[in-house]
Each structure stands twice: as structure tokens, then as C-alpha cells.
């Protein structure tokens, strides 16, 4: 609706002007594509679970000490953002919103502590993946590696821009 489009644009302008510290954009369509086939009953629960668990884990890591790297604050002007996930090899990034012209990206690697202790080439893999992203996308890229007790490894992504986004829901 016209009201939604106006609000969408105004919130982005508020973020750019500094009235909002950060505006995170999320598309239900993108979340659904990440999840794959989701039944009608339970649809909202699955979509919300993906979003909430991602935001929760990013907040946990923002308040934790990495064993390598760090989560850098974005530039003052980069106040429009979205989340994403990837496998830790960086083969396929899945963004929660398709940002036009992202300027900065932060990878948050959540890796099983035992793997961090035993896998000798893991550091090299992570650094080469991050470097490749910085070169191919012409972005400022940072990353942090965090130990976990989870068996599954995860890579969370924060994408930032200062550019007003079109409504691509």
C-alpha cells in the first residue's frame, strides 16, 4: 500500500539521518527461499524462528570475544543493514534482504571448539574466503571467529549500506 511504501522510505531516511542507529531490512520472500518448502501450518513459526535465532546468535557474538578477528562497527553512514547466512566455506550466501550496493560486510563464524583446536587449515580457508569476497564485491570486509559447543558450524553475515533501498519484498 501507499502507506507502507511511505513508511518504508521514511524509516530509511531516519536511519540515514541518524535518528535511528540502524535499520535492519528483512524480506519474508528471502526467508522463505532460504528455508525451502515450508508447509502452510507452521509457516510463520519457521520464518520467525530463522530470523529470531539469527538475530539472537549475532547479538551473543557481538557481546563475546572472538578467538580470531572481530566484529567491526560499520561506518557512520552505513545505517541500513540486513542479515544473512552461509556455509563456513562461503560457497553460497543467503541474504535476508537483497541490498542494493552493500558497502560493508561482516562474517561471524560460529565454529565447534574442537574443530578450532584440531583443523590445521581452517584459518587459511576462512581468510581466503573473506579476502575473495572483499576483492570480488569491492567491499570493506571484516570477520570474527567464535568457538561454540554446537556440532554444526554456522556463518552469519551482516551487510551494510548507506543507500536507500527499493521495496523488493
Model regions and ranges:
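Tubulin/FtsZ superfamily GTPase core signature
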Residues: 1-169
Amino acid at each position: 500500500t501507499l502507506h507502507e511504501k511511505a513508511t518504508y522510505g521514511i524509516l530509511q531516511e531516519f536511519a540515514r539521518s541518524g535518528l535511528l542507529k540502524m535499520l535492519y531490512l528483512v524480506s519474508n520472500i528471502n526467508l522463505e527461499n532460504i528455508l525451502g518448502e515450508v508447509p502452510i501450518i507452521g509457516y510463520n513459526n519457521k520464518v520467525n524462528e530463522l530470523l529470531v535465532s539469527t538475530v539472537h546468535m549475532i547479538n551473543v557474538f557481538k557481546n563475546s570475544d572472538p578467538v580470531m578477528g572481530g566484529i567491526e562497527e560499520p561506518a557512520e553512514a552505513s545505517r541500513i543493514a540486513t542479515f544473512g547466512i552461509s556455509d563456513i566455506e562461503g560457497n553460497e550466501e543467503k541474504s535476508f534482504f537483497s541490498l542494493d550496493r552493500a558497502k560493508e560486510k561482516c562474517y561471524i563464524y560460529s565454529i565447534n571448539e574442537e574443530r578450532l583446536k584440531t583443523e590445521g587449515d581452517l584459518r587459511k580457508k576462512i581468510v581466503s574466503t573473506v579476502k575473495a569476497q572483499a576483492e570480488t564485491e569491492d567491499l570493506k570486509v571484516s570477520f570474527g571467529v567464535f568457538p561454540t559447543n554446537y556440532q554444526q558450524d554456522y556463518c552469519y553475515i551482516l551487510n551494510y549500506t548507506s543507500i536507500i533501498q527499493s521495496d523488493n519484498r
